[in-house]
């Protein structure tokens, strides 16, 4: 568990700063609504203006609601930070036996801000000039009544609100996140993620305010243009402002054709204006969808409720006891419903066999309680005594009296009801008899199969010298040989993993070329620890070293491969229980730089969960060293969670960290969608030997056709795996120039795949620690632990091209490590 280090006062101050920033956003909203109050009817009531005005009304209402949700969400986040500080202060005060520490007062929850819709833009704006009456009958429409002055006033109000909205939140953002990042608390990453969400929502809202302002200014300009064009056309037949026609027109009355021509020109101008306004209305509607996303994100935080601890108070203790009692009632209530079904007529019709067995068990159990049980069963008194303990939950009163009280109360109340305790006499009777006779014993471990020891070596004939340098086959110890003190560290689950061929599974046993001598027993491997565990095979000649074994620790045997007896493979050792063994499949070849014995070109066996790699995939480069270098060259480092943790190579099930078996009983998440052979091959290749080659090519931007195909296959497989949302950690070594690139407030794009782990303890151990520790809040990372070659590492893998927002960058004064906190974008 990570250490706790919290300054409640500093944390409370940071929360108060966030609340103040939220309240300042409320002031911006109030100023905006006041400015918009005088813009009613600015779009006009003509067909074009009314259509655009209705679109504006919907967008403006959504945008103001998004502003209110952002304000309420930011205040709620601040309240949560202050409540967290209060809880830590209470815990610190309760742990101070001297009574010197004082708790912070519980903060007041900030009330939500409610806003109404702005005034409608649809209404009578500007009036038509007097000369409009000469052409109105020929046009068939009313004067465009939009008021450009009101439109520009509304645009200025929106632009000012957007700028002030962004400035108010930014003023408190960076310093607050830095203050919270300095606290070593479990919820630190979640708080910073919430603040990042608020910052993103604020930026979206401010951007949409500027968009609305630009659209209103554009419409105001179009209104002015159409008004000017119409007045210019009207001036050809009359004074547009007075409507008085020329004298010759009154005398000759030959202006009707001219008026119709002018009316047609005005209709063309108005039609063009309508099309432009319709396009502008579509842009305003697009604003609504962008605003809805920000509203949905921040309304989640606005609806949060924050409570403070009741521990150590009489009210808290009383509520805890009541809750435990109701928990017991609920558990027994569920059992009551199940018992009611078991003795119901419906079950008799649906499951007559099961119903008959239940009733027979009740009769037999009742006989035990009245002393009519089979021979060797305890008497009636002892049976009733055991039954009473079951009904009253006697053994649970010492550990959880409140829950035991709830269970006992429910059982006593439903004692004689169908489905109650008396309906379970068969079960209780058998339980009492078994308990009193000591029949309930833990299942025994099956006896391992008897294995004959290897026969003693045959004595040489007289006159022949005894062969020297021919040691017999040695059974493996089941544990990897320890590496040298100055050798490389074990593969870190958050840093680097072995290259191709560096951590192969057990090698396939060599097959003898000649039949063994008759009468000689065949040496075999050490017997398994228990039934169901695979026998650890002896490593093949020339096989590469195990993860914790240096290359120099391997001594090639001197016995020829033809005379070496084949050890039992893991699949063969389980053949009696699980069917015929799976045939071994060849894995990637061993690096050329490693020494090999006579049988060094024998193929290695692929682990059960590794899948079958693509045929024709290129092998790992022969120049790769047996251990990946500690210092990566780019980005987060080339490491992944691909190496055994610093612990006993064998876990409780007898499997080593590399013995990934589907029946290992591990608690990993299953894939969301079925994985085909291509998916398994891609995952096995990456979590095994192929990560280094792919990541190097991705960072250099030099993927060949084969590598691109493997990257695409891995990306496709990751999409089928479950998403992990939560904190992950990664340890690595970064050079100073790469470390300098991680600056708070910037977004880092990782071109390669990024491996992390959920096991914080293993990642921070001395064996795996580098000079840098990344603490990342994952939102779309994929849990590959169920299909990894090393499932114990609990790996969370981010796809290539993932983006991370750098929240903070600090140096741990105790360890000297750089701690970088990031949020996946």
Swiss-Prot record:
Q: Name one GO molecular function term.
A: nucleotide binding
Q: Where is the composition biased (Basic and acidic residues)?
A: 656-670
Gene3D superfamilies, A to Z: Toxin ADP-ribosyltransferase, Chain A, domain 1
Its Enzyme Commission number?
Answer: 2.4.2.31
Q: Which PROSITE patterns match?
A: TR_MART (PS51996)
Which chain regions cross the lipid bilayer?
Answer: none
Give me the stretches of Pro residues compositional bias.
Answer: 443-457, 468-491, 580-589
Keyword Nucleotide-binding attributed: yes
Residues in domain TR mART core?
Answer: 650-825
Got a GO cellular component term for this one?
extracellular region
Could you tell me where this protein is found in the cell?
A: Secreted
For region Disordered, the annotated ranges are 435-673
Where's the active site on this chain? 730, 755, 795
Identify the keywords attached in UniProt to this record, alphabetized.
Glycosyltransferase, NAD, NADP, Nucleotide-binding, Nucleotidyltransferase, Secreted, Toxin, Transferase, Virulence
- The name of this protein is Putative NAD(+)--arginine ADP-ribosyltransferase Mav
> What species was this sequence derived from?
Mycobacterium avium (strain 104)
